[in-house]
């Protein structure tokens, strides 16, 4: 079969190499269980090429290979170049990943390796990650160095993320901790934790930012400590309001204190922003 495509205002019939992705053909292979075991990229002349990042054009990889355990869980992923050798994937920072799963299929450990099968650090400095579960919900995420010792992520300043859930399995509290399990400020988010609340219909009504003592705190990059949301009878978001650490109405860094959502006959959402005085912002 052929594709018709336009290139520099000229129509062509046949395969073409996509300028944004760097390839013309993807070949995907499966094992006898229907599991994808490889994905390879080629140009219009069937030569192996690396797929490209659509934004900056950087080469990512020419082939991805997958391994599975006896239960069908993804046990390993390898990235390869046009010569068939393992290469560091630009976005992930490693050439190979190896996974472990529990009896329920939950991912419990992930280790990262370079093109020579040596352990390699991810951005943030960690070499491996472990996850712990309760009734299928991930309750802890831990980051380790090359010696499998807990370590502080250099990019976000925490070693452990602890998560709590309600009886319906909804997240109600996420907390960032050091290697001793004590709360610390995540330097990306600018807080030590997130608290979530829901109404009787399951709509998320509150997002609260917590400090290391568990108190409400203002995230400096946002200008508020608490988001309060209201919904209509169809579960559509109607109002979003911001509050400070003393639970007083406040505005974000752009002066917006409240957002009202309206819906037209087609159900398309429209937003209107207001300041603390109730004046609509343009």
Language model segments and positions:
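Buried hydrophobic residues that stabilize the cores of well-folded domains
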Residues: 1-282
């Amino acid at each position: 079969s052929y594709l018709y495509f336009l290139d520099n205002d000229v129509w062509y019939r046949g395969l073409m190499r996509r300028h944004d992705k760097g390839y013309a053909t993807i070949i995907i292979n499966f094992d006898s269980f229907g599991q994808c075991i490889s994905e390879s990229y080629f140009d219009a002349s069937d030569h192996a090429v690396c797929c490209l990042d659509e934004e900056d054009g950087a080469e990512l990889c020419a082939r991805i290979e997958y391994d599975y355990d006896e239960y069908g869980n993804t046990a390993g992923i390898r990235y390869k170049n046009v010569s068939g050798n393992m290469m560091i994937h630009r976005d992930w920072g490693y050439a190979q990943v190896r996974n472990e799963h529990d009896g329920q299929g939950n991912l419990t450990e992930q280790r990262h390796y370079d093109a020579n099968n040596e352990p390699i650090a991810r951005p943030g400095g960690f070499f491996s990650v472990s996850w712990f579960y309760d009734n299928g919900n991930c309750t802890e995420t831990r980051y380790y160095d090359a010696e499998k010792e807990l370590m502080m992520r250099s990019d976000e300043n925490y070693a452990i993320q602890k998560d709590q859930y309600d009886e319906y399995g909804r997240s109600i509290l996420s907390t960032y901790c050091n290697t001793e399990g004590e709360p610390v400020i995540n330097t990306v988010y600018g807080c030590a934790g997130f608290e979530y609340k829901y109404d009787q219909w399951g709509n998320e009504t509150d997002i609260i930012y917590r400090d290391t003592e568990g108190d409400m705190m203002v995230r400096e990059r946002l200008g508020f400590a608490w988001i309060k949301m209201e919904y209509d009878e169809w579960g559509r978001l109607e109002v979003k309001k911001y509050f400070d650490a003393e639970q007083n109405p406040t505005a974000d860094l752009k002066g917006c204190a409240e957002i009202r959502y309206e819906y037209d006959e087609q159900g398309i959402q429209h937003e209107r922003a207001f300041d603390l005085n109730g004046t609509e912002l343009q």
